[in-house]
Regions:
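Glycine-centered tight beta-turn/hairpin loop motif at sheet-sheet or coil-to-beta transitions
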Residues: 22-24, 47
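Small side chains
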Residues: 19, 30, 41, 57, ...
Length: 124
């Protein structure tokens, strides 16, 4: 069985993964940069920046990467478009642009069962 460090080491810029916050919140994250020690990611739905330890997959706040399973191409594309949409539009000025499309809803519904059925090995 491959250990979690091996899976985490393979993550690269542009990939999407799932993490969980200590309160159980789902964090759909896009890798924005990597170095030997850290993996920097942005939450797609909130645009929060997170820094994960590359060895453990944890943030200083206790968020933990729990799945790095690749998404089907179309789902990945829709989530990248959603990330871009949330980057360029201001919800206070253009709230109508933040309404989810049917494709975006479908992609977000797909994520939970997909990542839940493809977990990383637990921390040792």
């Amino acid at each position: 069985m491959t250990d979690r460090k091996s899976f985490l080491a393979k993550l690269d810029v542009g990939e999407i993964f799932h993490a969980e916050a200590p309160n159980g919140a789902s964090l759909i994250c896009l890798v924005v940069s990597v170095d030997e020690a850290n993996l920097r990611a942005r939450r797609i739905t909130s645009q929060d920046d997170l820094v994960f330890n590359r060895q453990s997959g944890m943030t200083a706040d206790g968020d933990i990467i729990d799945s790095v399973a690749p998404l089907p191409g179309e789902i990945h594309k829709v989530l990248l478009e959603l990330d871009r949409k949330y980057q360029i539009y201001d919800p206070n000025k253009e709230p109508e642009r933040f309404r989810l499309t049917e494709e975006e809803k479908k992609a977000l519904r797909f994520v939970k069962p997909h990542y839940s059925s493809n977990p990383l090995p637990p921390l040792p």
